[in-house]
Amino acid sequence: DDIDTSFSHCDLIFLCTPVEYNAQYLEKLKPIIHSKCIITDVGSTKSSIHESVKLLGLEKNFIGGHPMAGSEKTGYENSDELLLENAYYILTPTKKTREKDLDTLTALTKLMGAIPFVMDCAEHDKTVATISHLPHLVAAALVNLVKETDNSNGVMKQLAAGGFKDITRIASSSPIMWEQICETNREAILKVLDIYLDSLKKIRDGIKNNIPSTVYQLFEESRSYRNSISDNVRGLISAQYSFSVQVADRPGSISIISAILAANSISIKNIGINHNRELGEGALRIAFYGVEDCHMAVKLLKSYHYNIIERG
């Protein structure tokens, strides 16, 4: 409703609304913008908006954008000035995108601290369906599985701390956003869901038919591939900068560690006891706001002879 002729002076416009509204704003912008204006978006699905762009005849003006950084938390209070630092920023030009416009947007994403990555819109949607959309759906389903199968005294919920809470952290994401994502990237998500269900069926059949090699091969292949994934670039699912420490259950144990870190200007995001340590974690888990603080804390506490457990 606020789109008026003042937009006619814009050389670059970012559409930062929910995906389902972008097409409406494109339609309103079309008669207003000048011929050399660049329009981009920050939506997590691309094929849908590219279809709208083509129908509106805005292919020369539009370059799709997807900053691959985010958080499971929503709202202004959870904003992060370093959100795009070392994060991939996907750009999806159209067949009619002007090369100089792509160069301009590429340079801008670099100035933001991000790493530009150019790809086709359909390939983008297939990729994010696999590495982001499916994991979010699986995490939400796992949490609801515990909720629905727990007994009346809530023993599953009580014991679900630690590893389970870590692997399902992204289930806390915005329901509205994920409803829209599944609507706009339906085909790609359904394809990868079918592949995943086939994989689960093979695992189930292997367990049912008592074929131990099925499970061994599953974890052997996944471990090898996961270890080859870089930790140096921020991705679609926000990273956790944390580690655990082996500490004795004595008065003052936590405060001593907190004091050591504070004396060295290292800020703690969260600190707490690990009650479920089946993954080999230490009794105390500490989370930080960034990777540098995390690395500094590891080095510092090791110098005080603390036993640090870092998970790859």
Q: Where on the chain are the PLM-derived regions?
A:
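Short acidic-hydrophobic, aromatic-tinged amphipathic segments that line or gate anion-handling sites
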Residues: 1-3, 117-118
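Rossmann-like NAD(P)(H) cofactor-binding subdomain of soluble oxidoreductases
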Residues: 27-77
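A conserved regulatory-domain signal marking ACT and ACT-like small-molecule sensing domains
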Residues: 225-312
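Internal alpha-helical scaffold of NAD(P)-dependent oxidoreductase catalytic cores
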Residues: 83-170
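Interdomain hinge/lid region at the active-site interface
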Residues: 152-222
